[in-house]
A protein has these predicted regions:
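Enzymes and membrane/adaptor proteins characterized by extended Gly/Ser/Thr/Asp/Glu-rich
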Residues: 117-244, 266, 271-287, 313-327, ...
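C-terminal motif of bacterial Sec signal peptides marking the signal peptidase cleavage site
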Residues: 13-16
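Phosphate/pyrophosphate-binding betaalpha-module
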Residues: 247-264, 290-307
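Short, well-ordered coil/turn segments that N-cap beta-strands
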Residues: 98, 122-124, 158-162, 213-214, ...
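Generic hydrophobic/aromatic pocket-lining and core-packing "Φ" positions
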Residues: 114-115, 205, 248, 252, ...
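Sec-dependent signal peptide recognition
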Residues: 2-10
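Mid-to-C-terminal alpha-helical segments outside catalytic/metal-binding sites
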Residues: 402-427
Length: 427
């Protein structure tokens, strides 16, 4: 009994009993209600039997850092679009300057008069003739020509590279004195060796490019049944149109491989007349069907082979265009050369100093008519009065709208496209 009482007291102590009911039962007073502020009870001091399990708060997963969105590469602007945009930003003066190829006298430096024309009108292209080459120098004129072309470029009024041209055909038209002889067109035609023609013109182009010349006005693609009865003579490759085409295309390839533009001439053909367009306006009474069957064959093949330029002759073909010499004829330049043959390169007129042109129109009118017919580059040698007249005519025609901005830009784009082939310049 005594043991039972001891157990009961121990139980009361453990349970933190707060009192006893009248009927002798033990009453449990919860700890949160057993005491009052300031009153210490057994419930307040006794350790609880059970401790509530701690609430488990899961550690949040680290938020992944998103990969940065890569900046998309800008879409490259096609060169054709860049070129058109560049031309649209040029001044009229700069554009007109790209449409002329002028010459001057002198072998050492640009004359002061021509230097002023280059500066005033932003002349974009230059032609050299025999009078510019010191062929009697020990090296045949090459070193002095390199110095001359450097001076020419120093006078350029824009950062657009110049086309610097010359005509080296071989035979009687060589300009320099060549250490290793370059044979004439007739000899190439007689051998009918296209590979020999390609190698010769590749060598010519390499030598020209090394002295600062990037355009060769060659080869001659005129054909004639009897070349001796024409003023071109041995400059003609062959009386056979197929042979002339084959050798001519090889020459074009060689020039391009050597770093030069190739300008074939004299479209649509100078071989059916004995008259010299330097002195008079030749008249050739042949219809278009005859021309297509013979005279036009070498030109069509050269265009297909990728010739860079075509020079047009000052000859009247009344059965094709009774009102205009070929160089001023929309029929020849736009309908036939560009339309039928698909030519997209440069169209140059033969030298504007020639009587074959000047007997047909004033220089101002001729320059405008040439551009309107579809031409791109007006060529004029060392006559600075003529050059100013040409520039005056073109400037007035652009200002009064005779030559539209669209037509002007079209030719400038062609000229700049050609320049990119022989330089590292880009718009």
């Amino acid at each position: 009994m005594k043991r039972l009482w001891s157990l009961l007291c121990l139980l009361l102590l453990l349970l933190g009993c707060g009192g006893q009911a009248a009927d002798g039962t033990i009453t449990y007073v919860p700890s949160e209600t057993a005491g009052r502020p300031g009153q210490v009870t057994a419930a307040a001091t006794a350790a609880p039997l059970f401790t509530a399990a701690p609430t488990f708060t899961p550690t949040p997963e680290p938020t992944a850092t998103p990969e940065p969105t890569p900046t998309p590469e800008p879409t490259p602007v096609p060169m054709e679009v860049r070129l058109r945009d560049y031309v649209a930003g040029m001044t009229d003066r700069e554009k007109i300057g790209q449409l002329v190829m002028f010459g001057f006298s002198g072998t050492k430096s640009v004359s002061s008069e021509f230097g002023k024309i280059m500066a005033d009108y932003a002349v974009g292209n230059v032609i050299l003739y025999g009078q510019n080459i010191s062929r009697d120098d020990r090296d045949g004129g090459f070193d002095r020509c390199a110095q001359l072309t450097q001076d020419i470029r120093a006078h350029s009024a824009t950062n657009i590279p110049l086309l610097v041209s010359i005509d080296v055909e071989g035979g009687t038209v060589t300009r320099f004195r060549w250490r290793n002889k370059i044979v004439g067109a007739d000899a190439l035609g007689q051998s009918d060796d296209a590979e020999a023609a390609r190698l010769q013109f590749q060598r010519i182009a390499t030598a020209l490019y090394d002295v600062g010349i990037n355009t060769d006005l060659a080869p001659v693609l005129d054909v004639a049944k009897d070349p001796s009865k024409t003023f071109l003579g041995k400059r003609i490759i062959s009386r056979d149109a197929e042979t002339a085409a084959r050798i001519g295309c090889a020459a074009v390839a060689g020039l391009q491989e050597g770093g030069c533009l190739s300008v074939v001439k004299h479209f649509p053909g100078h071989g059916a007349t004995a008259a010299d367009s330097h002195n008079v306006t030749p008249v050739v009474k042949k219809g278009l069907a005859e021309l297509r069957a013979y005279e036009l064959v070498p030109f069509e093949r050269a265009v297909a082979a990728g010739a860079d330029g075509v020079m047009v002759a000052h000859i009247l073909y009344p059965e094709v265009d009774p009102d205009n010499i070929a160089s001023l004829s929309e029929i020849f330049l736009t309908d036939i050369l560009r339309g039928e043959m698909g030519f997209e390169g440069l169209i140059l007129a033969d030298d504007f100093r020639m009587n074959g042109l000047r007997s047909q129109a004033s220089l101002e009118q001729a320059a405008v008519r040439f551009i309107l017919a579809g031409g791109d580059l007006v060529l004029c040698g060392a006559n600075h009065d003529y050059q100013r007249a040409i520039l005056k005519g073109l400037t007035e025609a652009v200002e009064n709208g005779t030559i539209s901005e669209e037509r002007l830009n079209e030719s400038v784009v062609r000229v700049l496209t050609a320049k990119m082939k022989v330089s590292d310049w880009t718009p």
